[in-house]
Amino acid sequence: MKAEVLIYAYLAVCAAMIGFNIVCIFIFRAKDKRLNHYSERFIKIVRQVIEDRTVTEAHCKYLSHKLKKINNLMAFDKTLEKLYAQDPEQIKTYIEQLLPVFTYLTLEYKKKNEIQAAYFPYIIHKYQIFRGQPIRIVMDTLLELVYSPSLYVRENALQAIYSIGSVDSTIKALWILNESNHYHNPKMITDGLLNFSGDTKKLGEQLWEQFDRFSTRMQRVIVDYFRFSSPDHKERILALLTPQGVDDEIAYSCIRYLGKFAYPPAYPVLTGIIEKCQHNQWIYTAITASALTNYPGDQTMDILKELLHNPNWHVRFNASQSLMALGLYYTDMIDVFEGRDRYAGEIMRYRFDQKKMKEKEATGIGLGSK
């Protein structure tokens, strides 16, 4: 009897789930129909405004009233997407004339729940609405949203700030994150800074000016941002790497920077790291082995060959990769292949086999193409 009750209960739960899914399908379809209906109505209105070549005060008031509702804003988003695909320049010009509308809406959406509050900055970022025009009310509101415990609200507010291109507001946003108890993934911050639309040189100077006051985590974010954005910081990055006691994570980022952007004065520092760390700090050694790719020369090849005998697999792997990137031939590695270290020989054979396979694939593609 108990087994039958459990089976009936299970069937009832399954039936309830199926019923719930069916209801959700109808609700979502009805919602999509409403959005499409609203969007078509907005398309007619916007096209008429574009034809008249004038955004009137009445049109701004109409949008200010309508777009306070999230469904209308979503429909307006669909409208702009469709029209932007047809004529980007016209829509950019149209959006530029709507700054008063979006300034007003910034304050309205600040009062709404987290999901709606996150959606509005997304629209600002998506259409670059305030780019180059950091209106104080807008920037203050976006900075307040960066305090939010919700990751979605914070990230969308940050993306909106980056898209506007205000150096001062971007620095303020970083300080909010720096002092916040809410975790924000460092990679997301780095990637966001790469989207900054303003004066990147001025931003870089401001970041260096305040660098020492930031937390270690934020300092690493800044160094990573420089690594992906500009070769103009080599001297400062080297100076950051040189002192004793520098945080390991920051040091790793500095080494990667100097590996991407070759800087001759950094070479003795990099080789010194390998000499000091190869027997007890494999992460330093592995990262530096990769960095030496951009420092070709006999000394570099000798160092990398020596690292092929390192007991750590990651060090050997990176050293072999760098040797191949330096353009070595099979004959250059005879001493390794004929040596007593089986692991060193194996990893280099793997590299050369991999190279042959890629060459064969490229040849096959070349022969098959017309």
Map each language-model feature to its residues.
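N-terminal signal-anchor transmembrane alpha helix of single-pass membrane proteins
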Residues: 1-40
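N-terminal topogenic membrane-targeting module
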Residues: 26-114
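Amphipathic alpha-helical repeat scaffolds
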Residues: 46-47, 77, 106-110, 142-143, ...
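Amphipathic alpha-helical scaffolding segments comprising HEAT/armadillo-like alpha-solenoid repeats
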Residues: 63-64, 96-109, 132-145, 167-178, ...
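Structural detector for internal amphipathic alpha-helices that build alpha-solenoid repeat scaffolds
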Residues: 78, 86-96, 118-131, 155-164, ...
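Short inter-helical turns and helix N-cap capping residues of alpha-solenoid HEAT/ARM repeat scaffolds
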Residues: 112-113, 149-151, 181-185, 214-215, ...
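Glycine- and small hydrophobic-enriched segments that form the cores of compact globular domains
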Residues: 138-213, 217-225
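Eukaryotic acidic, Ser/Thr-rich intrinsically disordered low-complexity regions
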Residues: 329-370
